[in-house]
Curated annotation (Swiss-Prot):
Protein name: Profilin-3
Organism, as annotated: Malus domestica (Apple)
SMART domains membership: PROF
InterPro entries xrefs: PFN, PFN_euk, PFN_sf, Profilin_CS
Reported function: Binds to actin and affects the structure of the cytoskeleton. At high concentrations, profilin prevents the polymerization of actin, whereas it enhances it at low concentrations. By binding to PIP2, it inhibits the formation of IP3 and DG.
Lineage: Eukaryota, Viridiplantae, Streptophyta, Embryophyta, Tracheophyta
Keywords: Actin-binding, Allergen, Cytoplasm, Cytoskeleton
Listed GO MF terms: actin monomer binding
UniProt keyword annotation of Cytoplasm present: yes
Family: Belongs to the profilin family.
Subcellular location: Cytoplasm, Cytoskeleton
Length: 131
């Protein structure tokens, strides 16, 4: 299966008649493996800051998580495994695997829990596959 199919079929999937706003799979070097057409252009330093928070949990909390110039307030995640952020009625979930970052961005009517399930389920599967 191609990386684009993982984004299209597993991250941008139907969720009770809705879907994520945007999604991507990135390498831990910040390279784009695959992304939805709606995924925002991001800066390398934004990905570097996200990776730093996975290595040193809590580093994003004081400043917020930035992706594509959008600031998200960091909310409870799973240290070293999942970072979650909130902005208004939407937010972001980032799951780290051994080789990649899976990113899902949502807005109402998709709920934070629905985004978490979609992103983390695929991340867990990729971890089981050694990716």
């Amino acid at each position: 299966m191609s990386w684009q199919a993982y984004v299209d079929d597993h991250l941008m999937c139907d969720i009770d008649g809705n879907r994520l706003t945007a999604a991507a799979i990135l390498g831990q070097d910040g390279s784009v493996w695959s992304q939805s057409a709606s995924f925002p252009a991001f800066k390398p330093e934004e990905i570097a800051a996200i990776l730093k928070d996975f290595d040193q949990p809590g580093t994003l909390a004081p400043t917020g998580l930035f992706l594509g110039g959008t600031k998200y307030m960091v909310i409870q995640g799973e240290p070293g495994a999942v970072i979650r952020g909130k902005k208004g009625s939407g937010g972001i979930t980032i799951k780290k695997t051994s080789q990649a970052l899976l990113i899902g961005i949502y807005d109402e009517p998709v709920t934070p829990g629905q985004c978490n399930i979609v992103v983390e389920r695929l991340g867990d599967y990729l971890i089981e596959q050694g990716l």
